[in-house]
Each structure stands twice: as structure tokens, then as C-alpha cells.
Amino acid sequence: MGTLGKAREAPRKPCHGSRAGPKARLEAKSTNSPLPAQPSLAQITQFRMMVSLGHLAKGASLDDLIDSCIQSFDADGNLCRNNQLLQVMLTMHRIIISSAELLQKVMNLYKDALEKNSPGVCLKICYFVRYWITEFWIMFKMDASLTSTMEEFQDLVKANGEETHCHLIDTTQINSRDWSRKLTQRIKSNTSKKRKVSLLFDHLEPEELSEHLTYLEFKSFRRISFSDYQNYLVNSCVKENPTMERSIALCNGISQWVQLMVLSRPTPQLRAEVFIKFIHVAQKLHQLQNFNTLMAVIGGLCHSSISRLKETSSHVPHEINKVLGEMTELLSSCRNYDNYRRAYGECTHFKIPILGVHLKDLISLYEAMPDYLEDGKVNVQKLLALYNHINELVQLQEMAPPLDANKDLVHLLTLSLDLYYTEDEIYELSYAREPRNHRAPPLTPSKPPVVVDWASGVSPKPDPKTISKHVQRMVDSVFKNYDLDQDGYISQEEFEKIAASFPFSFCVMDKDREGLISRDEITAYFMRASSIYSKLGLGFPHNFQETTYLKPTFCDNCAGFLWGVIKQGYRCKDCGMNCHKQCKDLVVFECKKRIKSPAISTENISSVVPMSTLCPLGTKDLLHAPEEGSFIFQNGEIVDHSEESKDRTIMLLGVSSQKISVRLKRTVAHKSTQTESFPWVGGETTPGHFVLSSPRKSAQGALYVHSPASPCPSPALVRKRAFVKWENKESLIKPKPELHLRLRTYQELEQEINTLKADNDALKIQLKYAQKKIESLQLGKSNHVLAQMDHGDSA
């Protein structure tokens, strides 16, 4: 407010709730100086505009404002006075009246001028409408009611035979191509330096990554028009506002991408390296004055799914934590983002604001000041304050970013930032990386110091054409940079390095040539992995049928037991997934139709399935053949959906191939024995991923073969498991004297006892159900026999 706000006498202060007011007030408090705080540029601009408005600044009727706008033109159509009132009135009139109603009032004035035989007034009215069409023609493209009223006005002018007036209000000059070009034209980047940028995340420098994130952010920010801000004010949400939705979704996507890129690394040291890299990216974003992306990156690093990783934080240097603390303090919401507002106000030239903060300021200003004053006059000060605030954001779109963007990397980031993970899935991955300490009390997710949830859950509307365009450009970029011999294939190793920048589900592809990936396969991969593609429902839905299970079965969605005697749950006829009735609509896994095979040999399994998808050796992963058989996906995956083995895992491919369980496994170890431990459990050999060769092969075949490491971490919820059917399991069991078993701890024994008790209770309940069923059948049989006897006696 300052001295400028006190100098004006109005029922309500015009700057209340605006961004400049709190900033100036806080600066005056912090300086402890008798001198008043220096007014900001926005305050000075608003003061000058109010001086130019004269008596209208204190409030005026709507008719007076319209008449003042019309009288701004001379007989030749030139502006004879300042056009600031025209700008404010034509841009902000929707706060108090619709555009169609405003044009209707102007049309009524034209009728009155015709009745009074005032051709000069009619001509000025047409000049005013021409100015409206020329400067704000996008309103006539987007508002159907305004277009309809405009046609009525044109018919009125034509009916009176005024050819000159008809030419002035002609709307055919509006060219739709100009509007579309403005929204899609390329950003004028700095072309002074040309360089080739690596598409590998590990090879990307923080400066390159920050520049390309800034490019994407500015590309999205500059598409938000003046009318988009007005729609947000009127509706108080981003519904039916696609440009603002995309900007918000990009910010949320960057925050999730940062979390998943950290969590995608299997060891604390590697996670710390990614964490440090993003801190350097944040520093570069600060230098570029890109506060919106800076908020997204720091918000992702401060998220509780990352901050809880104690082992990872132990490998982060003190200097990095100090920088994180400084960035957190800069973006803190304390004192209404006072630190950010100070830093933002000191920035000049190119800068990207935190959109959420300024939109909240707009809403506060819109709600705090009334539309009309006590005497029924329009509150011009409110229109002026809102106009200055929005115009300041729009003017930032005209400043070119001081960077050079590589289009290949832009396509890569465009796809990799488009995520669809939920908070629960991210927390599952975090706890899988570093499980909770059982001795410590469970931690509830706390609000991080930097929050990016002002519009969480916003996602862009899917567009198949846009998806296909980005995917094709991404594939072209990959083959241009990595297919050096131009044979149409890239190696598996190169592709996995590229996929390290994509923290979405990694699907195993059926290669046309062993160890090589074709253009069609990589295109299918990106299309399948795209989050918008998934939201479009282009995947395969499940074909669930109510099923009666004859043996203990667990839900694939929640890992819970399917209770009941008959029709306990639902089973997909295509892929074999089992779930509760209440979980049927909550399944997030895509249905992958199977090709049934009566018999699959071990040779086929080992040749088709990557070693990273084979089940690890463990207590509850006993090797047996399911009764219902396995099936092979068309892309080469082998998945076992029988009731015998159910598991929920996250597959991470990257620096090392790793399979992490994030949900409870089924407690039943084997259909024939639930109390016996597997012979190899407790040995000194570290459990891992193995390929088990069949005894029907030659004796020279290796029993255990370690799976090769994959350098592409990509967290996603997938369910992959292979099995081998043994003809004679006794041949593999060594005599007891040869086993070197370690003593089991008290916690392990207690856990096993609890597991067995739970299994026993479940079996008791099933036994009771079975007994009741038998009793009911016996009773029915007895009644049937008695009925037959009675019928015979009566006969």
C-alpha cells in the first residue's frame, strides 16, 4: 500500500490483496528505516493510470465508462486521449458484464444516435467497435454469443445503408491462422552456439538440463492468454482452460519426475548422485530466473518420499544440504512468499514467475474488492488493479529466453515428464528402497517446506495426434543419434541407457533380431509407456468373470485373501488376474491377452524371457508348475497368473536389474507344504536372480546362472514371473548333513509362527464353511428322500 494507497480516498483500498502491496509493506518493516518504502513498478504504473482517468478513477456508472471509451476517438478514427481506459474496459469488462451484453449496450447507443440523427456519434461507435475487433479479435473467435450479437449489429448497420460503417465493423479480417500461429510459433532462442546434446540422463550436464526444462516451461507459460487469466478469475478453477491445465500439469510432472529419477537408482550412493545433480539443476534454474520450474524441482526433492531416505541423505555432502536449505528458504510460503517476492522483484529481463503464487494473488484481489461501490458505480480501481496484475504476467511472454534448445532433447523430456503415478505408488517405491525401521514409530507424511500442490491432480486433456507426433519425433531423434550404420536397429544396451530418462514402466519387447531393437518396436514402446496414451484407454481392459475358487487365492490388487465358499472373487478370462469385487474397478494393470501353450519347455522359457524377469530364489517362491499352466504374451513376456504364486513387484531396470516387492506376498508357501522351509534358504549364498536349468538337459548345464545387469532404472508396477516344471525335485535336494544352515533369529521364528497362525485361522474358517455346506446338502438330501417316501405312500 505505502503512501500511494493512503493518498487516495476510496471506500476500499485498490491495492488490497495485490502482489505489490504485501511486498512493499514487508520491505518497510524489515528495513527499520524512517524513510518510506520505495513503491514498486506496478504501483507507479497503477498510480499514473488513475491520474490519467481523472474523476472516473473514483468510480463511474457503466454507461459513463462506455461513453468515455467512445469519445476517445476523433472524427477520423484516431485516439484523441489516452487509450488506457479502452484497454482496461475491453479486457476486464467480463468481471461485471459479459461481452455480448456490452456489445448490446453499444448497439443500443447506435440505435439512439440514428434516431437523433447524429452521424458523428454513429461513426465514433463504429470506430470503437473496430478497435475492439482489431485489438481483441480473439474474443470474437472464442465467444459464440458475442459473435451472434455482432451479426445482429452488422445487420442493423446494413439495414440503414451505411456502407462506411459496415466496412468498419467487418469481422472477416479475423484470420484464424494468425491466432493458431501465435500459440504454436517457435520460441526465438539464442542461436549463437550450436552443440550436440547427449540424450542420456547420466551424461546431461545440469546446465543443459535446466535450459531445456526452462524452454519447455516458457513454451507452456507463453500460451496462457489474457482471457485464460480472466476465465480463472471468474471460474476460480482451471476447468475448461486447457492452456493453464497444461502449464500446471507440466509443473506437477517435473516434481514427480525428480522424485522417480532419484528413487529409480538401486543404491543409496547412486540415489545421492542423482539428488546432487538436481541440486545443481536448481542452481542453474535460479540463475535463469525460472522460479516456476525451480519450485517444482525443489518441491520434488523436499517431498517426504525423498526426505525419508536416511541412507541416501547420509551420502549427500554438507554443502549440498546447505544449498537445499537456501533454496527452500527462498521458496518458503512464510509471510506470503515474502522471500520469493523480493527476489522476483529484483529480477530484470527474462524471468518465469511461480504461476500458483500469482494466481492466488489474483483470486485474493478479486474476492477482496467489490465489483460495485455503495452508490452503484463500477469499482474502476478493482478493474485497474486486476488489469495491471494480469498485464504484468502477459508482458513476460514477449521476452525471449537466453538459451539454445536441442529439439531431440526437447522431445525426450516431453515424453519423460508425462507421468501418471499416484502418491501411493511413489511411497511404495520409497519404502521398497529403504524400508521403515520397525523399532521406530510409523511416520505420517508431513507437509514439506516447499509445496507444489496448489493445483495437484491437474492433467492435460489427451490428444492422440499430439502423442503420435512427439513419439515419432523422439524415435527419429534416437535413430539419428544412435543408429550410426543406418540399418534400422539400435542395440539393447543403447536403448536401456536412453530409457533411463523415462521413469515409467519398462516393457519387454520381442526383438526382430536378437540383441537389437527396430524402429517399430521402439515406437510401440514409447506409445505404450506414454501416460496420456494410458489415460486414453487404448490399452486392453480386463474381462472379469465371477469365479468360484477351489483353493486359497489372493487378490492381485490388494494382496488380500478371497473369502467365501462360492464366488469368492473375479478372474480375468484373458490374463488370469484375480481380485475382490471391490477391487475390480481399481486395478491399474493393463490386461495382456495370453496365448495358451499346452507345454512349454525350459529351453523356450530361457530363450524368450529376459533373465531379469525370472523369479528370485526365496522361501515362498518354490518352483512348481501351476495347474492352469502359464502363457506367453505376444511381446515375449511370460507371466504366471495362477493362484499358486501371487506377488506384487516393482521392476527397476537400469544400473542393476532389481525386483523389489512393494506389496504383501501370499502367505501360503506351497500347495502341498506350508511349514517346511526350502532346502536352499538360509545358505550363505546371496539370493538373487537365477535361471534354473531342467534336469532333462545335459548334466553339464549350469544349475545357476546370474542374470546380467541392466543399466536402465525404470520404476513401475509390473508383475513378471517365470517358472520351471521339475520332473524329479528329489534329485536336487541334497542330504541334510551337506547343508550348512544358519540359526534363525527370534524375529524370523516369531514371524513364521504368526504366518502359520494366520494360515491356520484361514483354513479353520474355510473348514467351517465347508461343514455348513455339507450339512445343508445332507439336510436337502434327507428332505428329498422324505418327500419321495410321502409321494409313494400317497400313491
UniProtKB/Swiss-Prot annotation:
Single GO BP term = small GTPase-mediated signal transduction
Report the activity regulation comment: Autoinhibited. Activated by diacylglycerol and calcium binding, which induces a conformational change releasing the autoinhibitory state. Regulated by DGKA. Regulated by DGKZ. Regulated by PLC gamma and F-actin polymerization.
An example Gene Ontology molecular-function term: identical protein binding
> Per UniProt, where does Ca(2+) bind?
483, 485, 487, 489, 494
The answer to whether the entry has keyword Membrane is: yes
Give residue spans, biased composition: Basic and acidic residues: 1-12
Q: Where are the zinc fingers (Phorbol-ester/DAG-type)?
A: 541-591
Q: Which CDD domains match?
A: C1_RASGRP1, cc_RasGRP1_C, EFh, RasGEF, REM
Q: Which residues form the EF-hand domain?
A: 470-505, 506-532
The UniProt entry lists membrane topology as:
Peripheral membrane protein
- In-chain residues carrying the UniProt-annotated modification Phosphoserine: 597
Metal-binding found in the keyword field: yes
Please list where the region (PT region) is annotated.
Answer: 717-795
Q: Which InterPro entries match?
A: C1-like_sf, DAG/PE-bd, EF-hand-dom_pair, EF_Hand_1_Ca_BS, EF_hand_dom, PE/DAG-bd, Ras-like_GEF, Ras-like_Gua-exchang_fac_N
What name does this protein carry? Answer: RAS guanyl-releasing protein 1
Annotated source species: Mus musculus
Gene coding for it: Rasgrp1
